[in-house]
């Protein structure tokens, strides 16, 4: 828990120091009250006392109480500010860290767990700062101060108070030993229930299609019951604490009065009033001592959950992704590439030496093994794609097609060999610079909540800051925060040129026809995940998004599978015309999609078993020939 406090800002530390001062002030005022109570008791018992003196002492008590109230309000105000801004910072740190994660890190944590860590766990930390931190600071100060006040006032009373404190600490220790292991289990079980709920909501259509509602309900009930039983155990254990604290506190007061009664009975007439006054004061201070330990016990209730949550949050923040960004921001120039032997002098003859290579991809004896696997997914892959080339990849399911193209944008790094883009090893590139060169269309098309326009133009833009300033959570909330977010969206409004590029990209992807039929056309609303459009429409918008970037390299991971043959052909022809200078890598299952490619790579069990044009592979590669014969007619094969 203490490690996460290093993320507090200087302003927040200053606010906590102010809270510390006001807590000390509050303790001082609280411990002054028994003194005035003793004085009023003495005045009441004193003959010939003036009522005015009692009113003065009572007025001082009211002022002291008001001072305590003011200090408590100031402490609560600054604690709430610190908790809100600190929680915001932790969520932002987690989000930005998760954005740097690759598939291996996502697999390690799981999406459901990451959501829980950035919401529920951060809330637990905020709750501790708002309430627990005050108690953690206040309780020891109050305990020490109150003990100093009562030291030497009476051996019997002091011994009784000490016994009560020991009993209290033993009870709290036993309870904490019982419940602390359960708090970590509760966070894990919360992850599980979020996972089941998210899986059910995401796969709702499949659940209904297979009439698996009862099965899903059973899975949810199992997870829900496990979480509920754990919560019941901790709640039952913690429910003993408050009655136990009250019993100890009331028992101590009773013991003090009982001992005081015997002391007063045996005292002389002149000492009775002094003993009675001391008993009242001692009782009040003893209750303050018990209250301080009671507050400390409340800290023990909040601390375990916050500590577990802080550990889980720090686990995310401190996780270093396997794929680390390099420093290079550009590829080689023609002169550099010629000197490095990346291209030959004949290839460089038609270009100026100061021009940069663009869209050139080279795999040099690349092998790849997934982090948690022992078997290689790819072995000894070598090929080159020059600017403007169309390279297709085909093979059976599980042959490594998607794994191969995932190495280009560095979703994973090669286990052996090297992947070069524009003559530079991709591991040397700054990740942002590398991915700015690439337009990527994933196998499972995904659209974001927004509009057609915002989805097609998705991504960063030249001149925009990489780190967007965070909204100040301590100053903006509710509708004000919503207005700030809307204002930020308005500031990202497309220029006329960008809107024209959106329309061009949709034309290339053959999406304009259905987009214009939607309400609002390019401003039509898109639901999260693109659930309000068909699979083919999602794919076309995903293709448009990649084309909009005007990248050096276009990667299509089986991105034409949801298109009919006619649309598939039209889209590929449009891409050939519009993005003729871009290098295109196409993963496909349909031979008809890749027949016109400049080079076709045939993968089988992670190995490159064929490389050439469609006609060449029909003659030289058995695997390709079998795939083609299973899909094409005799006339198409002989054409």
Language model regions located:
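Juxtamembrane helix-loop junctions of ABC transporter transmembrane domains
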Residues: 1, 21-22, 29-42, 55, ...
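Helix-loop-helix
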Residues: 50, 145, 149-166, 176, ...
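Residue-level recognition of pore/gate-forming positions within transmembrane alpha-helices
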Residues: 23, 65, 135, 139, ...
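ABC-type nucleotide-binding domain
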Residues: 334-639
